[in-house]
Amino acid sequence: VVGSGVAGLSASMSLSRQGYNCILVEKAGSLGGHAAGYTCKAINGKCQKCGACLVDDLLARFGDFPEIQVFLETRIDRITRKKKGFTASLNGKGGLKDISCGAIVLATGFKPFDPNEKPNLCFSSIPNMITAVELEAMLRDKELPYRPSDGRQPETIAFVQCVGSRDPKRGHPYCSQVCCGYALRMAGRIRDLAPKTKITFFFMDIQTFGRSFPQRWASLQQDFIWINEIPGDYFVSDGDRVGVSVEVEDEIVDLSFDMMVLSVGMTPTDDQLTYQQMLDLSMSSEGFMLPDEDRGVFVVGSASGPMSIEKSITDAAGSATRVIAYMEGAR
């Protein structure tokens, strides 16, 4: 199993539970992937079902599976197909090591879109413009957001949706599915802890999430300011505020905020191409890996496309059934 995010952990435990020997390879120095850095978004003590706690739960339960071999800070240099199964050459802090396996589960996850790929955002030159990933870390560490320029708590915050998603020019025509959910939950968390904070959303449209969303939408419209447009120009305004030019009621106006959060989408990882070439895998229309399950290669979680934490866990657990079917048939 390659990758120890929620999908990799879920797949490993599901397979181990059925008596299969699992080897978990992770290039980072710890387990959990991106989701291990996410924060609880409960409002007034009520769970918002963001999935962040599911990661902690998986990591806690992973301790019950000491039989799973874990290689941290390890990369795979080469994968060779054999008559039955594969040989993978591992390169890690313990040196070089070849391992044999009957099937490969790629749970390599995703890469958050890099705003520097969109020059009009001026991301590197606007100090109080951050990504939603950075906001997650802020809320997990300090509970409340703060401006990177001076550490002050912002009184006004703008969220810009669909950054790096629904963007055919950048090769990302798809919706990342999770951005609206995480942005609205974090905005709600901030308002719960700092009720006077004014929050504005720049959006194309809103991706619904959760069964209760239609009922909640009315209150969300009242809680935040909604501007149905994505700004084209971004600049530093007075007091290190983030300025934007936007059309409001047929007139171009400049608005400014203490801080701006870019709701970045999910893109394929940098090492995806390496695994595609090693295993002769095809690519989906969205640019993510396609599995080759008839030949023992399975792709799970967000390695196969944008996916929430909860869906990644269930997808990986479900794929374990197919891995077992393949292994039984290959014997």
Model-derived features with residue positions:
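Residues forming the flavin
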Residues: V1-R331
